[in-house]
């Protein structure tokens, strides 16, 4: 009888720890998806670089707007870039040594999407 009681307590404990963590993760993912849909393929300014997001089979990917020389476009040109839908972009899934601070800006773009309150 005591074994059954301990097993029951174990499942209650696990249920009270795991379920709130899963629901919090789902809430954050939903908020990030709502932020992603609100952007509507427009670019946002992160670290004086223009970023946008794509929803792919592996999740949301950040991408930075670049000119024809693979130099990130500054935030001062956001209206031009949002009006011109044929802008070149680089995805953040690969590290770029030729662009200083590329990885840091990408991490910040992801954190701005997922952790805004």
From Swiss-Prot:
Record carries keyword Transmembrane helix: yes
PTM remark: Contains two intramolecular disulfide bonds. They are created by the viral disulfide bond formation pathway, a poxvirus-specific pathway that operates on the cytoplasmic side of the MV membranes.
Any one GO BP annotation for this protein: symbiont entry into host cell
Protein name per Swiss-Prot or TrEMBL: Virion membrane protein OPG147
InterPro entries assigned to the protein according to its UniProt record, in alphabetical order: Poxvirus_A21 (IPR007987)
Pfam families reported in the protein's UniProt record: Pox_A21 (PF05323)
Species whose genome carries this gene: Vaccinia virus (strain Western Reserve)
Underlying gene: OPG147
Residues annotated as transmembrane: 1-21
Family named by the database record: Belongs to the orthopoxvirus OPG147 family.
């Amino acid at each position: 009888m005591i074994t059954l009681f301990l097993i029951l307590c174990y499942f209650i404990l696990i249920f009270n720890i795991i379920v709130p963590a899963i629901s919090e993760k789902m809430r954050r993912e939903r908020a990030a998806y709502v932020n992603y849909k609100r952007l509507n393929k427009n670019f946002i300014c992160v670290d004086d670089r223009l970023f946008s997001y794509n929803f792919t089979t592996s999740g949301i990917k950040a991408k930075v707007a670049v000119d024809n020389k693979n130099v990130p476009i500054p935030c001062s040109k956001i209206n031009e870039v949002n009006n011109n839908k044929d802008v070149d972009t680089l995805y953040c899934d690969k590290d770029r040594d030729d662009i200083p601070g590329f990885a840091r800006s990408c991490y910040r773009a992801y954190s701005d999407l997922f952790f805004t309150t």
